[in-house]
């Protein structure tokens, strides 16, 4: 019989169960046996979320690939690109709704051509045409840039977005919440404090957000942990985060990645991915209930393993993911509801469909077993 004694100190475990993990505790857990960390995180997941694993039938809609930013990790932006018209956006949303989507995620670059008045028209038009769709849209960066372009404060922009029908703001553009890192990888983006102020203002305006962390580039381990602890501090104040989504950096077709690859460094390892999901569960226990294992970054099989390491959500069907694909993502752009159910049951968990705000949706696969038009059934919904 295997009887190896756990090496995690009892006081560290006690603090974890109470939601009082310290930075010193987190470092100790990451430096120790990873499987003990996974076991602890999995137990905390069971306490916080039970044995259900959620997913959302959604579609990404990329409004524009034009962007005046200079992010070194991005392979998506272009100075000569497209901006979708309102009619084109509504068409994409309509196709998604027919396929059973309950959410559309509207995002893109930031450009003077997309000011706050444009975004307000997009939100109002979508909500008028599809009132039952959850509108998960814009990042703190887009809100700041568009608000400034339109000559209004961030607070006013958020109030007007809420009034227009915005259900949830994306928590992207966080990258790593360290100004040292941001000056290297995204010098023209909002500062750490501006990101914090924007999501805090959104929460206070009644707009929930998710939170993200993009890791595996120039940040240190301490900066990763500081990021997650920052999310915890915001959540203590506002309670407005629905989930944390760890996203591994994709090092292809972008300047930051080119430098990494030239120096012999590659993207985060699978073990690092699982450790970050696990330590995020430990740090955020009692504060943020949902930790996502995003299949489009991790791949389906590692995402399934992550369900044993603290994750309780697999994200969305997506239907398209231009940003990951541009940076070398190779895991496809679509997973059908049927395949999500298969993955979750295969991990010994209970699948649950949800919406953006983690409200349960009665499942019932639309159309051809939930397959989005244009994807072959033989591929189980994965365009690879």
UniProtKB/Swiss-Prot annotation:
Residues involved in [4Fe-4S] cluster binding: 67, 71, 74
Cofactor or coenzyme needed: [4Fe-4S] cluster
Cofactor binding comment, as recorded: Binds 1 [4Fe-4S] cluster. The cluster is coordinated with 3 cysteines and an exchangeable S-adenosyl-L-methionine.
Disulfide bonds: none
Enzyme Commission number, as recorded: 2.5.1.147
Broad class of enzyme this protein falls into: transferase
Catalysed reactions, as listed in the record: 5-amino-6-(D-ribitylamino)uracil + L-tyrosine + S-adenosyl-L-methionine = 5-amino-5-(4-hydroxybenzyl)-6-(D-ribitylimino)-5,6-dihydrouracil + 2-iminoacetate + 5'-deoxyadenosine + L-methionine + H(+)
Stretches assigned to the Radical SAM core domain: 53-286
One GO MF term: iron ion binding
UniProtKB keywords: 4Fe-4S, Iron, Iron-sulfur, Metal-binding, S-adenosyl-L-methionine, Transferase
InterPro entries documented for this protein: Aldolase_TIM (IPR013785), CofH/MnqC-like_C (IPR045567), CofH_family (IPR019940), Elp3/MiaA/NifB-like_rSAM (IPR006638), F420 (IPR034405), FO_synthase_su2 (IPR020050), rSAM (IPR007197)
Pathway(s) this gene product operates in, as recorded in its UniProt entry: Cofactor biosynthesis; coenzyme F0 biosynthesis
Matching Pfam families: CofH_C (PF19288), Radical_SAM (PF04055)
Subunit record text: Consists of two subunits, CofG and CofH.
UniProt cross-references to NCBIfam families, sorted A to Z: CofH family radical SAM protein (TIGR00423), F420_cofH (TIGR03551), PRK07360.1 (NF005609)
Function: Catalyzes the radical-mediated synthesis of 5-amino-5-(4-hydroxybenzyl)-6-(D-ribitylimino)-5,6-dihydrouracil from 5-amino-6-(D-ribitylamino)uracil and L-tyrosine.
Family label: Belongs to the radical SAM superfamily. CofH family.
Protein name: 5-amino-6-(D-ribitylamino)uracil--L-tyrosine 4-hydroxyphenyl transferase 2
Top-level taxonomy: Archaea, Methanobacteriati, Methanobacteriota, Stenosarchaea group, Methanomicrobia
């Amino acid at each position: 019989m295997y009887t190896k004694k756990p090496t995690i100190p009892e006081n560290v475990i006690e603090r974890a169960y109470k939601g009082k993990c310290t930075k010193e505790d987190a470092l100790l857990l990451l430096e120790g046996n990873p499987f003990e960390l996974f076991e602890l995180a999995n137990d905390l997941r069971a306490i916080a979320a039970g044995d259900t694993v959620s997913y959302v039938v959604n579609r990404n809609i990329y409004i524009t690939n034009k962007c005046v930013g200079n992010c070194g990790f991005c392979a998506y932006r272009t100075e000569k690109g497209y901006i979708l018209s309102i009619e084109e956006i509504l068409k994409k949303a309509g196709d998604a709704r027919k396929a059973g989507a309950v959410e559309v995620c509207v995002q893109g670059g930031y450009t003077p051509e997309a000011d706050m008045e444009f975004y307000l028209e997009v939100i109002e038009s979508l909500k008028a045409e599809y009132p039952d769709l959850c509108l998960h849209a814009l990042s703190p960066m887009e809100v700041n840039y568009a608000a400034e372009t339109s000559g209004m404060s961030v607070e006013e922009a958020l109030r007007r977005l809420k009034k227009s029908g915005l259900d949830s703001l994306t928590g992207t553009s966080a990258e790593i919440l360290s100004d040292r890192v941001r000056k290297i990888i995204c010098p023209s983006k909002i500062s750490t404090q501006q990101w914090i102020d924007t999501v805090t203002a959104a929460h206070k305006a009644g707009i929930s957000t998710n939170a993200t962390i993009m890791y595996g580039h120039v940040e240190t381990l301490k900066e990763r942990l500081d990021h997650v602890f920052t999310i915890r501090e915001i959540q203590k104040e506002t309670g407005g985060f629905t989930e944390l989504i760890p996203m591994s950096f994709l090092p292809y077709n972008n300047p930051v990645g080119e430098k990494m690859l030239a120096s012999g460094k590659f993207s985060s390892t699978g073990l690092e991915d699982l450790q970050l999901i696990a330590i995020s569960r430990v740090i955020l226990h009692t504060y943020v209930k949902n930790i996502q294992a995003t299949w489009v970054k991790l791949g389906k099989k590692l995402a399934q393993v992550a369900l044993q390491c603290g994750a309780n959500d697999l994200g969305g069907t997506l239907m398209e993911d231009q940003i990951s694909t541009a940076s070398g993502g190779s895991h496809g752009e679509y997973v059908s509801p049927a395949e999500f159910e298969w993955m979750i049951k295969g991990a010994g968990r209970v699948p649950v469909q949800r919406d953006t705000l983690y409200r349960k949706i009665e499942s019932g696969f639309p159309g051809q077993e939930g397959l989005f038009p244009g994807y072959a059934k033989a591929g189980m919904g994965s365009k690879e």
